[in-house]
Amino acid sequence: MQATLLAVALPLLCGAALAQAPWQPEEYPISYWVGPPREFNTLAAWQTVKDCNFTVCGQYGGYSRADNRTRLDFCAQLGLKAMIVDGRTSWEAAAYEGHAELIKSLVADYGSHPATYGYFILDEPSADRFPALAKVSQELQRQDPGHLPYINLLPTYASPTQLGTPTYAEHLERFLSQVKPAVLSYDHYALLKDGSDRVDYFENLELIRDYGRRYGVPTWNILLSLPHLNYREPSADEMRWQVYTSLAYGSKGLMWFTYWTLPAWEKEFGGCAIVNPKGEPARLYPIVKQLNGETRVLGKTLLGLTSTGVYHSGQVPLGCTRLGVDALIQLPGDLPLLIGFFTDASGQQYAMLVNRDHAQPVEATLALKPHVTGLTEIRAADGAEQPLALAAGKAKLSLEAGGGRLLRLTTAFAYAELPQPLTALDFHFNTAADLEGWGGLNSLTQPVVKDGTLTLTFAGADPFLVRSFLRLRPDQYSKIRVRLRLESGNPEGQFFWTSSEEPGFADNKYLSFPLQPDGQWHEYTIPVGEHPLWQGKAIRAIRLDPTTGGATPGSKVEIDWIKGE
């Protein structure tokens, strides 16, 4: 929050508490700073908050304990939760020897109320206050673990004097290690009056996500809804952009600065927040109502997801990472897109795709890795699941300016398993995609088993394939027979083996045999029983070189069967 607004901008929080269990949100936390003033502490005012799809009520200053109780009663009646602002949670309380007793009396007043969500402690502290904040926050967690102790941090554009540290990263590190908060909340207002955006907006998202993941702490973002100081009045697209970029970065709670418009602000800044000074819906109210509604719907899924990576395409913002070629979804390199990847507890994979441009809609063609067999959108409007059309491993999506779409990925990959030991040589490749344990490919690529044939593509000068895990008795076979078709290459093949006595392939354990690289099927017999290092040996692995010295790159060798006799 801005320092000039702090005196009146009392905060809020989000999530739902489990009685005397560590705080965990039951619903995606959506809240605001600066709620109805004391004289508007009415059921009608809180109904307007509820109708805007907020889940947690923020508060404005000047509430007495009785006012807070009245507010909580209204919230409970409407199915809302509320943050408590009370001087007994102030960071200065840590200076008193009896601060634990202060908190005890606070919890006695509010802790058992069904609408209590948490307790506001401080906004935008300097690092020198972290030790005191740690005492207050941890005492609240000890005495009332089911409710959230809330502290909000500065943005990246704060000065070292404001931060109390030379860098923002150290500020986060000290806060998380000393205070041990339940959430990592911050504000960053990127929309400037000159029409530009702060260049460090995404870097701030990166740092918050990174440190939140390091410490296992959920992150919250505070978004701009009030034109003030050097910040412009957001458009609907810019409001959407703030929401979906935050969601893609794994934010587990969103708040708006502000909900209420004070008369002095309206006069000084010439605009309104979400409601006007009389508590009546202003221009942004229906916009926020829709975005909050979408967040509530998507939040049912997002709360259970873990952010695994966030990447960009187009011109990559400062401090961010370009999407790499190994990602499951590939983006057009020239479009300003953002993609966040997630997994749930079962390993199911999700992605949030966002248009980083809040001025223009975009259409994008996504290229999927071969093992991604389906994309299903979780619709923000109603939570319904909508399969997306795929064609040749690609999907086309349209995105509103600043908009995002949440996708669930369906994947199917046949992971190779350790071959089972074999006591016989009889390979016929009759099961599609089953290599029957053959591997160790060298200078051979693209193995395909189809229609009773193993097909391989030449890609180098020393092609061979290996079948290990054999348990052949001594002298079990006297010859190896192979039926194959060779398009090109030298007219000579080789057959190697290993034994229990000599477990490595070597030039003293192989036989050459003549080949016909004419593109026709031929059967070949390799008289292994005549070799002294085959005779009487327990064979453990075999290797087939379908030609020596390689073949024309891209040409094929097809193998019908390999068997021992």
Description of each model-found segment:
Residues 3-15:
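Bacterial N-terminal signal peptides
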Residues 19-373, 380-411:
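Glycan-processing catalytic domains of CAZymes
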Residues 339-343, 385-390, 442-450, 456-457, ...:
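Short, exposed beta-strand/loop patches in secreted or surface proteins that constitute
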Residues 348-350, 361-363, 394, 404-406, ...:
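Intrinsic-disorder/low-complexity, polar/charged segments enriched in Ser/Thr/Lys/Arg/Asp/Glu/Gln
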Residues 407-414, 560-565:
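Short beta-strand-to-coil "C-cap" segments at the C-terminal boundary of structured domains/repeats
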Residues 414-442:
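Extracellular carbohydrate-recognition regions
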Residues 454-534, 538, 546-558, 564:
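Extracellular ligand-binding interfaces
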